[in-house]
Structure formats: structure tokens, C-alpha cells
């Protein structure tokens, strides 16, 4: 063959699976991020970048159990062949830290100043939707009952019809295979193949109106001078996730925001989450305001009612008996009453000492001592009921 007839192309014999390496690594990294989010959820929900994000779609949060990529050296100088014991997986750490297994003093921990380098952590971009899906998975409004079934209805889509034509995304694979099998069997060869046009079955939806129950949540927060920056941040973190949970899972839930010190007032949502107050503390004022709202706007015959009150427990001692009486009056009209107390140092609480005598099963309380308790308080107040759900 002459030079003029030589082919002007070459056949590549490289391993094409290597071209997917970057994609596979990216998928593995995303799986690690999701696993880290799940394992660190109690700490992540109170990250300031999330609570102060005003509900932005994507936020950057530190995930301390997820390391940044780096080369690690094996300090063991012994000669060896291969690595591991045969059961290693892609991504496993095989290097040793050279400490000989001895526990060393960590940087920035314990008493006294340290001279070691700080601990690096990975800052991942996470969508609020991802956190919500992991967080709200097992939450629901407790004791939810039907109210005004004939008046309050919502649109609902149901796949309740089968047709021979439709969108390919709505094809009913099971019914299509059964139809093909029956047709082929009638012709003497029972088989799922071939599938003809006449065998195709598509699911079709209809919009129906379904009865739904109304509910209102009364978010009550102590904004007095005894509520410091940390206490207010914890309370607002809880109410931030509570409002997102309610608006994500329920279409017909109203939320009223009430702030109080010695006096209580209904405030806009933005002011509730941003404005500071001062002064003394008379908690009975906020319960009176809640009862006033119920009497004027939210009849128990029409609404499921859920009051939630957050405070540091530092209340005027002479007001405690009045608070207990008003809480008991509220519980007669409400499905559940929730009290959250931010008490980081386990100090004596005048309000909690009075509330511990309330024996009603619809009264729930939770003491928050650290940031992770916001997650646990949500789980405690909105835990799924073991019995039957609302029909």
C-alpha cells in the first residue's frame, strides 16, 4: 500500500472507562455530602448561615466530618507490598498519621493556649430543600382533627384513570406488560415480547377537591431584657424551622407571631425575627393575647390551634400561678400547647417549676441547653403520632 493510500486516522485503544472517572468521583462526593448532612443534622439546623439566610435556595455550611481533598503521607517506613487487608474500598484512608497511635492534644481544645494548627473543615453548598427533606421527613402536627370539612377544600391530583394514549412519562409498565402477555398468550405463545401499540396503557390524572382541616400556630416569644443574644437566637432558630415546616407540609395553616415582655403584641413576621426588646417579664400577658386572638379570629370549632411559647423561664414569681391558669384555659381550646425553655446553664427556672405540675398529655415542654436541641425540640413537639392519622 503506497503512502498516498495510508489511512489518515488512528484507532484509539485507551480505556474509555477512565473518561467517567470525574463523574464517578463527583457522584461519590455528593453521596458523602448527603451522608454528612444526615449525620450532622442536629448541628446544621442552627448554623447562622441558614437561619439568617431568609430562606435562600442555596447556602454554604461547614461540615466538619467531611475533609477537604489532600495528599496524605504514610509515615510507616517499613517495606511492604500493596496496601490494606483486602477489603478496602475506593476513598478509604490508608495513610497513617505518624503519631504511633498515641492520643495527642488537639488544637483549640481543653484548657490553656495551644501551638498546634487549627482543624480544617469542608464548606459545602447545600440547598435548603435538601435540609428540609431530611429534617421534615418524620414531622407532623399532632392531634390534627377535621374542621369544616364541607367548606375548606384543596385541589389534589390523583392518578385514577387508565387510557390507551398519553404521555410517555405516565406509561403504566405493569398493565402494559400484562396486556402484551395476554395478547401473545391468545396467539399461542405466552410471552411479554413483543409489545404492540394496542398493549400500551397510560395513567391519567384528574384534579379533585379534597376536604382539608384549617390550623393556626401561635408563635409566642419572650423578648425581655433577660433574654440574651444566645437565648433569642435559639428561640428564633426554632421558629424559623417551624414556619418552614408548616408552610412546606400544610397548605391551610395560619401563623400568628406574638412578642412579649411585660406586655404582649402581635407583630409582623419580619419584626418577630429581627427586632430586639428589653424590659421585665410577665408571661401571662402573652397568654392573654393568645386567648384574645382565639376568641376574635380562630374559633376552636373551625381551627386546630397550636400555641408555642419560648422563654428563658425568668418570669415574675407572683405571675406564675396566673400563667398556669391561663395555660390550662388555652389547652381547653387547643390541640396541643408547647413550651420551650432556653436554659443553657441549668439554672433555676421559676416558670418551669410551675409548669412541671401540669399533668395534661397535650402539654409538651422541652429544655434547650445547646444548639443541637433545636433539632430535638422540633422532633419532640412535632413527632409523628403512633396511632392513626387524620382521615
UniProtKB/Swiss-Prot annotation:
Biased composition (Polar residues): 1-16
Leader sequence residues: none
Ranges of biased composition (kind: Basic and acidic residues): 21-31
Highest taxon listed in the record's lineage: Bacteria
One of the Pfam families matching this protein, by short name: DUF444
Annotated spans, Disordered: 1-31, 80-117
Record's compositionally biased regions (Gly residues): 98-115
Alphabetized InterPro entries for the sequence: Spore_YhbH, UPF0229
Disulfide bridge map: none
Family annotation (NCBIfam families): spore_yhbH
HAMAP family per record: UPF0229 (MF_01232)
Family as reported in the entry's similarity comment: Belongs to the UPF0229 family.
Record protein name field: UPF0229 protein BCQ_0617
The organism of origin for this protein: Bacillus cereus (strain Q1)
Amino acid at each position: 500500500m503506497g503512502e498516498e493510500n495510508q489511512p489518515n486516522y488512528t484507532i484509539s485503544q485507551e480505556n474509555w472507562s477512565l473518561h467517567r472517572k470525574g463523574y464517578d468521583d463527583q457522584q461519590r462526593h455528593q453521596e458523602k455530602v448527603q451522608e454528612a448532612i444526615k449525620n450532622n443534622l442536629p448541628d446544621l439546623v442552627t448554623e447562622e448561615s441558614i437561619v439568617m439566610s431568609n430562606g435562600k435556595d442555596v447556602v454554604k455550611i461547614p461540615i466538619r466530618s467531611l475533609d477537604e481533598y489532600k495528599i496524605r503521607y504514610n509515615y510507616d517506613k517499613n517495606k511492604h507490598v500493596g496496601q490494606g487487608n483486602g477489603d478496602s474500598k475506593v476513598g478509604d484512608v490508608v495513610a497513617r498519621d505518624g503519631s504511633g497511635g498515641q492520643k495527642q492534644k488537639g488544637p483549640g481544645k481543653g484548657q490553656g493556649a495551644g501551638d498546634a494548627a487549627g482543624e480544617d473543615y469542608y464548606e459545602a453548598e447545600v440547598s435548603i430543600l435538601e435540609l428540609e427533606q431530611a429534617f421534615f421527613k418524620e414531622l407532623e402536627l399532632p392531634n390534627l382533627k377535621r374542621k369544616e370539612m364541607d367548606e375548606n377544600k384543596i385541589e389534589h391530583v390523583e392518578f385514577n384513570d387508565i387510557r390507551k394514549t398519553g404521555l410517555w412519562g405516565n406509561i403504566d409498565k405493569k398493565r402494559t406488560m400484562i396486556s402484551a402477555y395476554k395478547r401473545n398468550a391468545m396467539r399461542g405463545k405466552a410471552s411479554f415480547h413483543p409489545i404492540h401499540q394496542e398493549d400500551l396503557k397510560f395513567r391519567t390524572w384528574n384534579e379533585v377537591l379534597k376536604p382539608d382541616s384549617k390550623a393556626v400556630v401561635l408563635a409566642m416569644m419572650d423578648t425581655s431584657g433577660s433574654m440574651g443574644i444566645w437565648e433569642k437566637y435559639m428561640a428564633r432558630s426554632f421558629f424559623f424551622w417551624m414556619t418552614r415546616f408548616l408552610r412546606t407540609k400544610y397548605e391551610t395553616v395560619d401563623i400568628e407571631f406574638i412578642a412579649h415582655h411585660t406586655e404582649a403584641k402581635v407583630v409582623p413576621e419580619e419584626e418577630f425575627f429581627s427586632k430586639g426588646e428589653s424590659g421585665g417579664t410577665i408571661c401571662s400577658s402573652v397568654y392573654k393575647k393568645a386567648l384574645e386572638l382565639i376568641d376574635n379570629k380562630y374559633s376552636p370549632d373551625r381551627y386546630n390551634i397550636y400555641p408555642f411559647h419560648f422563654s428563658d423561664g425568668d418570669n415574675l414569681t407572683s405571675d406564675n400561678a396566673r400563667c398556669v391558669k391561663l395555660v390550662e384555659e388555652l389547652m381547653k381550646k387547643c390541640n396541643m400547647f408547647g413550651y420551650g425553655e432556653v436554659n443553657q446553664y441549668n439554672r433555676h427556672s421559676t416558670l418551669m417549676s410551675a409548669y412541671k405540675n401540669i399533668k395534661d398529655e397535650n402539654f409538651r415542654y422541652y429544655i434547650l441547653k445547646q444548639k443541637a436541641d433545636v433539632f430535638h425540640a422540633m422532633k419532640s413537639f412535632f413527632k409523628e403520632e403512633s396511632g392513626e392519622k387524620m382521615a
